[in-house]
Amino acid sequence: MKPYKWNYDYSKTLWMKMYLAEPDFPNHRSKVFITFAEALDIIKTVDNLTLGIPKIIYLVGWQGLGHDDCYPEMEQVNEALKRPEDKTARDSLWWLFEEAKKYHTVVSFHVNQSDAYTATPCFPELVKADAVVKNAKGIPTPIEVFNGRDGYKVSYKGYFESGLFQKNWNRFCDLMPVREAGTVHIDNFCIAQSLNPYTSVEDEDAARNHMLDYIQSCGIDVTTE
């Protein structure tokens, strides 16, 4: 992993997550806690309370039907968060990004590159690229349950070496203001070493470092848990 030149001094910046929505899969809808319009109201209040200090807010549940949906893809904005006056939720998201600047706040994204679901459009590509953790028989194997669905773990080695990570990340940068934000929060960026008999922890760690280097080459800081 290369030495980084950070875009922000995180020791002098208030940075936090904002939980917008989560899936309600049985009813095929998003359970919304905070819309994009309501998020700006909160940002204004926080700015007043903090006397205008620099802030970064990472949006959680901005994609798909909400938190823990669509991973590891990052291109479908949650339509339930849209402002009525906007054509699409993506338009509303960009509006929030621009408006938040007036209140000393950078809006960015909470994303996940460790988990995958069969309903995610790129899941067949992940399997083909050997980018999903498998069992000893070579079969992709779920290891957790999120929102009532089987959750699979991403093999960073296959994900990066196949070029699929770069493809998904470039698409993310083209559609969302993440380059402009200059920072992103990657959730649960762990290594499923004991679950993957085909790669070592050293292989996965090296691939994760390559992913971090790639994101940094796009001019984006990475924060994580």
Regions found by a protein language model. Name each.
Residues 6-168, 181-186, 190-195:
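Aromatic-lined carbohydrate-binding/catalytic grooves of carbohydrate-active enzymes
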Residues 1-2:
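Extended acidic/polar, glycine-enriched regions
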Residues 156-225:
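Active-site neighborhood of glycoside hydrolase catalytic domains
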